[in-house]
Amino acid sequence: MAGRLSTADADREIHRFVTREQIDQLHEQFRARNNRLTLDELRELLAELGLFYTEDEYRTLCLQINTDHDRYCQWDELLSYLILGFQDDDPHAVKQSLDPPIAGDLCVKLRRQVYNIVKVDFCPMVYYDGSISWSQGHWITTSREGVIQYWTEDWKPALTARSVPSSLKRSKTWVLDTVPLPDLSMFCVTGLETELRLYNVVAACFTLKLVIERLPQPISAMAYRFGRDEPSRLLTGDYTGHIRMFVFHPERKVTTSGESTVTHVSLQDVLHGAYPPVECVDYGQLLPDIVRAVQFVESVGNVAELFIACAEENPLLSSARGRPRPAMVIHSLDLPAIRRIKFCVPRGVTCFAFEPSNELLVSGGPDCDLRLWDIHRPEKPSVVLVGHTSSITFLFLQDAGEKIYSLDQRKIIKVWDVRNRVLLQTFGQFSTVLVKGVPACAYYNKRARELVVASNKLFVTACCPEIALDRTDGESHTKPVSVLLYNGLYRLVVSCGFDSFIIVWDHRVNRKMTIITEAHTQIRNGVLEPVEITAACFDGKEQMLLTGARNGSLKIWNIGGRTCMRTIQIEEDCEVTGVFWQANRILAMGWNHRVVEFAAFAEQDEYPRGLQWRKQHSDDILCAAVSGSEPGVMATCSYAGELVFWMLETGQPYRRYDATNPRTRLPISFREGRADLMKPRKLTPRRSLFQMPPGQLAHRRLTRILMPSGLEQMRQLSIQALLFLAMRKMLPDRGTLFGSLDNGMVQVWSHHPDGGFKGQFNGIHMAGDRIITLATDKANRFLFTGTALGYVKTWYIENCWIPNEDKFHVNKPALRILFPFLLNDVVPGRAKRSARAQVKPWLLNSYQAHRACVTGLTYLDDTGLLLSCSSDRTVRLWTLGGRYIGLLGSPVNWQPLPMAVPPPADYRFRIPPDLQREVSFTTLKVLRGGKDSSRTARTKSGGGTATVGDIVGVAADRSKHTPMIETYGSPLAEPILNTAVLKLPSKEPMLQTIKLDRTYPSFPLYRHMVAFPVQPLKRTNKTVEENGSDWNELEQLLERTKALQFKDAPSDADAEGTQ
């Protein structure tokens, strides 16, 4: 980390510039001066080598090299700096995986079986055109008793059959091996009966079709290979080491005269070509003992087709052997043999795996050792991996031979790193869930990267599963991320999580610089287990990292050297919720109800167990903050809602408030044990930040839930996060402290003794949500809030809670250009509607950044980037306007970010895959930068497209002018709808049937009658015919009046009024 972290250019970093001879010259200069140089002498020495730095660059370089914080540079310090720089430039040094290879839980697919499973295989789907689909097919399990079961892809039963000897119907079989033949729709079984039984599996039928009998010895291992443009081959090995290959030609038909549908063919007939559909190639006795495994391999070198076979030494044979015999052989398929390689292993080989890309051959046997072979030098294994305590029965390779998985007889799996030749993981859960004393079989599914292990039950577990990049970008940690910090000295990001990992990131190129695993540990029930990291901070020079854990332990880390310098304990099993490094003091607090002070360095610590400050909280301390102005002040808040201001210089409290009633001041207790001055504890149980069930936050449909005023007053509130504004002076008329309540409100305080509560505003727009973390920039212009539902909001606070004479005019058009959220919407979203009635602050941005709780926010002023961490195990990068850059630790890389400027306008921004489908239109608008490419409108003339800005502009001017809708040249004629299909409702009023209430003494009839307006009749001098038409209209009006009904049932008030 040392070299890449300096502010100098890459060509001026020491480890990249100096040569080996120049390092020797530096060593001679240090040796001549007692192995140490002053900082000025070191600068002159580097200048002689051609390395020149400015004052700021050299000051940063000295802080990185000089870990002793003195005026001298030791040779050991410079050498450590160079070594760390070389390690950081190694591309393989930071590829350490956070998750172990087998990290998930075991998934039980089959419960306890009647017959123990000895073989698991997968039969893919083969279509009529010869194409193969590995995503469709059947799982097949076999028992020693010959019970064969077919299962669907999700392990639902499909077919159950039994294999019995073809000639001895009443005798029991003992199955040795099975193999499916997918292209022939057949299944091959071999047992102790010295015969090959081939069953036809079509349409849920399991029928015996072919029996190859009279084999010299029982077949113990089989392998099958098929393809569209090649014949199907079955490779077999027997108890004496003979290897034979059967080639199937289904296009060759044979007519049989017998009545039986089963064809019986002897091995000699197949060898002599008497049965045309099957040919046999006999390779002879290539191995001395029982063949345990055979496998076809791809072309190696100039040889097109090969196979590998291995044999285990028979312990029952007591014959003396003068010279070692081969236990594994690589042989060509063609005869005479073009290539034959023999490997001699003591006690034989039971299993092997081969990787054609790098020609890596791995073997395991009863001697419990894994051997890695170079096939071009078979005399001696290149590497021997020792670690198993029983015979190895199964192994496979992953990621082009980078990892080896091996399973032994005790059902313990070990994962090995081939490159570094070290053990990565020992997984022993199979030994606890499977019955003891019964061998287990295994099958590795390359497509799903899953391992199937079966005995009396069947379990499936994932082995380094691949990330589905269409649904997620991956993860940064293996458990929720709790702390996110930015180191200005090294210009790196540091994240800590509940997995007890400390990871240093180069966020510009998405690279892990340092990984510290098991940073905090404890021994429980005799087992060393990691402890969750809950708080962290840097020292003033940002050279040291202080972390606090859930068990109450504190550790000081050297970021440059990646070592733990000191370990402190505030209290046993006491979660640390806040740590601060002030000058030479360390302040820690948590669930111990008080602040504990330590000396930063052990030689200066007069109180090894810490100096406890006066107790002012009646419950656990949830959050704390330290002001950046003078005089130094620290604010702490407990679960009961007690907010206490402390003077850092003296450690004395000077103000105490209640978050539920912010305008009332609580008395300060100056004696221990004054329970009458303490606030009563909350009755609701306390939970950690990430322990809220997801179902409790999922079903949120309302904008806001309003509680009754009485319950609102009785409810005790606690502050979830505190934030000081460092640029604001300590004055009574200025809001300098923000605190987020658990009901979604944000309170504003002044930490001046004459200040107090200044106001509050609503910071959420979803019911039940709350603000978990707060952050701001150096100039205190913006306030960033992160909520429990994953939303990130940006507020403009520069002009809020300050005196009127200091307020100024805000350039809102410039902010609208910077934040796409401020663009007009046809229908305002919930975020805008919730903040519409608030006078201050101004909501600039709101979008969903995570699917889970946001636990930390950090803003980088130089580059304008906002980093967020969440309980969904991710750390994400955003621009100030809300554009998504990437996820730290993701396999999806992004363009390298500039060092000191924001990303350019033409930067390739993306949308998180997990947020593409289920987000609001407001979040989607922010993620797209105000451009909606999926919703485009055709223009009238040119046939072009109109963007969202054009649509919004048209919607804004809709009140001024509404254009006429163009039709086919003439207005539509009545009726517009086809009345024969859809009958229009009657235009007369629909009157309900009224049921009179007989409890009243009188009925208010006329009060509830609907009266139609009566139009006066006009008397004119018309003809008799015209007068007759008027009288007809009058009669129709009278008929409608007679059909009148009551409108509504009478009420009590109406009845009293009538009386």
Curated annotation (Swiss-Prot):
Q: Which UniProt keywords apply?
A: Repeat, WD repeat
Where do the WD repeats start and stop?
A: 121-161, 170-209, 214-256, 344-383, 387-426, 476-515, 528-567, 616-658, 714-759, 766-805, 849-888
SMART domains assigned to the protein according to its UniProt record, in alphabetical order? WD40
Q: Which Gene3D superfamilies match?
A: EF-hand (1.10.238.10), YVTN repeat-like/Quinoprotein amine dehydrogenase (2.130.10.10)
Give disulfide pairs as residue numbers.
none
- Pfam families linked to this entry: WD40
Asked whether the UniProt record includes Kinase among its keywords, one would answer: no
**PROSITE patterns, sorted:** WD_REPEATS_1 (PS00678), WD_REPEATS_2 (PS50082), WD_REPEATS_REGION (PS50294)
Which InterPro entries does the protein's record reference?
EF-hand-dom_pair, WD-EF-hand_domain, WD40/YVTN_repeat-like_dom_sf, WD40_repeat_CS, WD40_repeat_dom_sf, WD40_rpt
* PANTHER family the record matches: EF-HAND CALCIUM BINDING DOMAIN 8, WD40 REPEAT DOMAIN 95
- What name appears for this protein in its UniProt entry? WD repeat-containing protein on Y chromosome
**What organism is listed for this UniProt entry?**
Anopheles gambiae
Q: Which gene encodes it?
A: WDY
